[in-house]
Amino acid sequence: MSERNAASARTVACLLGPTASGKTAAALALAARRPIEIVSVDSALVYRGMDIGTAKPTRDERAAVPHHLIDIVDPADAYSAAEFRADALRLVAQIAARGRTPLLAGGTMLYYRALTQGLNDLPAADPDVRATLDADAARDGWPALHARLAGIDPATAARLAPNDSQRIQRALEVYLLTGQPMSALLAAPPRDNDAAAGLRFVPVALEPSERAVLHARIAARFDAMLEAGFIDEVERLRRRDDLHLGLPSMRCVGYRQAWEYLDGCTDYRTMRDKGIFATRQLCKRQLTWLRAMPERIVVDCCAPDATVRAVDALERVLDGRAPA
């Protein structure tokens, strides 16, 4: 964005951070001071019936402050970054038109990048292609499909673990639909970003000064989810004939581990440990994305007054006192 366009653009504050960094507390604290509406930037919160394992805001929290892009999709359905971008831009405009302040808050960095940088020309998901790949994986295993991907798109395969089923499937799907490797398509310039041209997104990032503190929070939160009935929640989902572990919804952190426990593949302790480890890995990926944003305003989420600091940073952004 040019200096002239930046000066005339409407600022949109964004509260980003990894799992368990305190985003909800900071957003609600800001809502006590300003007439905000929260637009969720979280790929797990879109799914209905997945409340405990996604740490969805409570009914009281959602009643106190308007929340958007929560409970909008059935777990049997997909929701893409392109759909998020269109929905988020529409909501930002509608909230501003009501005389209120939009606050984007969440930790799905792919969504944030799609919103702020636009999208490459990747094809939409194809159920038939995905069904074929799922069948191949059931027969041969995801490491075999990872090896297949390495033969056609070594750059993408190199950054994926052999069991990263969701991303391996997507990379193979893109190749089968376009005949081109995903790495080549992603290297192309994004499509025009006209819909966001009048907006200036400013990220406030909650990041840990001590990784061990965040890891302890993650473990405590996962244990609290288990005590709150997470296994029962997954069991209800598992009883549905139209849900399976290959769906994006069931790839949300914790759900696969709980499902496999219910299938008898692991014991309770192993399920817990795997769930916590998967959450820590998600946190690591989120921090990698954040640290690639030089424009972000960093708040130490481990500080005793982290919520106060985050609210202060967000208010500086909204008042035009943040660095340009």
Curated annotation (Swiss-Prot):
Binding site for substrate: T19, A20, S21, G22, K23, T24
UniProt record, GO biological process: tRNA modification
One annotated GO molecular function: ATP binding
Source superkingdom: Bacteria
Catalytic activity: adenosine(37) in tRNA + dimethylallyl diphosphate = N(6)-dimethylallyladenosine(37) in tRNA + diphosphate
Amino acids binding ATP: G17, P18, T19, A20, S21, G22, K23, T24
One Pfam family hit: IPPT
UniProt cofactor(s): Mg(2+)
Keywords: ATP-binding, Magnesium, Nucleotide-binding, Transferase, tRNA processing
EC number(s) reported in the record: 2.5.1.75
Site (Interaction with substrate tRNA): T108, R130
PANTHER family: TRNA DIMETHYLALLYLTRANSFERASE (PTHR11088:SF60)
Function field: Catalyzes the transfer of a dimethylallyl group onto the adenine at position 37 in tRNAs that read codons beginning with uridine, leading to the formation of N6-(dimethylallyl)adenosine (i(6)A).
Family designation: Belongs to the IPP transferase family.
Record-given protein name: tRNA dimethylallyltransferase
